[in-house]
């Protein structure tokens, strides 16, 4: 199998680099300065066991690869707000022997949130969800770090519509040769909804900074209470905190230090967009559909989007000001 990593940022480059180290055939898909750096200097990937430079083929789109191969695996690691453009571009790519990628090739959605699987299922016949537990950092072109140990990350995977198949097992085997644990599960979306609850704090970190603070923890708990209530009202199951702890404890330990997460990194790089619509916004959507007020998540989504649109630096708001906005929104309910 050849792995085409669509979005070679923090997550994509780490998975792609680790797969390449283990002998898998990999193509990294990137754009702009990052693509130029990867082509010129290679991928500089730092993990717990050191720094290596990987010379991996780089493409900016499907046209550069010509006909895709029947054994290609598409790993979608762009942020959800960029998923439609990527799915449309790659879905129409022709595959040797006839048909398109959307008709014949598997696409794995390795992203935060739960919307990309739904977007992919509108276009692709073979869609897999991946619940990504892989703290990684991408702040400058061509350079990525993922410092967890003893494993680089844990990647639960399965069919997005439920169930698992032999292909998932083969992909998992490649990942497990590459520094990951990759449990194949029948209910991958249940794991992704649980991860969604954890990601509700991304907007807090992005707007007020990554440093721990009791008021930030309190705001996250309020957002998670709304999230759990919305999931219950919608009849959506999610893995418990105990299940997640059992799956991860002692396997993906981060070294000491404060690091910004994916949303913080988006603001730091000045990308102009942020994934809050598909994290806090997912809870807002479910709340409106099922009669559950979500003022804290509404506030966090709105604040994060203002930061992204206006190019504000991460951490430019005090947690006191953000909490006051959430309190005002809650008082209006």
Q: Where are the language model's segments positioned?
A:
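NAD(P)+-binding Rossmann beta1-loop-alpha1 motif at the extreme N-terminus of oxidoreductases
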Residues: 1-51
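N-terminal glycine-rich phosphate-binding loop for ADP-containing cofactors
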Residues: 200, 204-222
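Rossmann-like NAD(P)(H) cofactor-binding subdomain of soluble oxidoreductases
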Residues: 52-144
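Rossmann-fold dinucleotide-binding core
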Residues: 110-195, 201
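Anion (oxyanion) recognition and catalysis
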Residues: 20, 121, 176, 232, ...
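NAD(P)-dependent Rossmann-like dehydrogenase/reductase catalytic/cofactor-binding core
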Residues: 217-333
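Residues at the starts of beta-strands that form the adenosine-phosphate
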Residues: 2, 25, 106, 126, ...
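Short phosphate-binding/catalytic loops that engage adenosine nucleotides
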Residues: 24, 43, 125, 180, ...
């Amino acid at each position: 199998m050849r792995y085409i990593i669509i979005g070679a940022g923090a997550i994509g480059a780490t998975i792609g680099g680790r797969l390449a180290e283990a002998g898998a055939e990999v193509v990294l898909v990137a754009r702009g300065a990052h693509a130029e750096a990867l082509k010129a200097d290679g991928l500089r990937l730092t993990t717990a066991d050191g720094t290596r430079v990987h010379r991996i083929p780089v493409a900016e789109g499907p046209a550069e690869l010509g006909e895709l191969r029947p054994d290609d695996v598409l790993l979608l690691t762009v942020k959800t707000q960029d998923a439609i453009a990527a799915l449309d571009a790659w879905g129409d790519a022709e595959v040797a022997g006839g048909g398109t990628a959307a008709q014949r090739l598997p696409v794995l959605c390795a992203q935060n949130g739960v919307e990309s699987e739904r977007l992919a299922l509108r276009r692709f016949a073979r869609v897999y969800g991946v619940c990504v537990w892989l703290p990684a950092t991408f702040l400058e072109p061509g350079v990525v770090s993922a410092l967890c140990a003893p494993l680089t990350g844990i990647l639960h995977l399965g069919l997005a519509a439920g169930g698992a198949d032999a292909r998932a097992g083969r992909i998992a085997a490649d990942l497990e040769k590459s520094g990951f644990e990759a449990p194949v599960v029948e209910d991958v979306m249940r794991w992704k909804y649980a991860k969604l609850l954890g990601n509700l704090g991304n907007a807090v970190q992005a707007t007020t900074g990554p440093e721990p603070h009791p008021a930030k923890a309190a705001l996250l708990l309020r957002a998670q209470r709304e999230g759990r209530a919305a999931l219950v009202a919608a009849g959506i199951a999610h893995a418990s905190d105990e299940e997640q702890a059992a799956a991860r404890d002692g396997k993906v330990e981060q070294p000491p230090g404060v690091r910004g997460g994916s949303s913080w990194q988006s603001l730091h790089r000045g990308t102009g967009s942020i994934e809050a619509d598909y994290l806090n916004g997912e809870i807002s959507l479910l709340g409106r559909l099922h009669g559950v007020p979500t003022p804290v998540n509404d506030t966090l989504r709105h604040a994060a989007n203002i930061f992204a649109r206006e190019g504000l630096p991460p951490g430019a708001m005090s947690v006191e000001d953000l909490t006051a906005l959430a309190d005002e929104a809650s008082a209006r309910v």
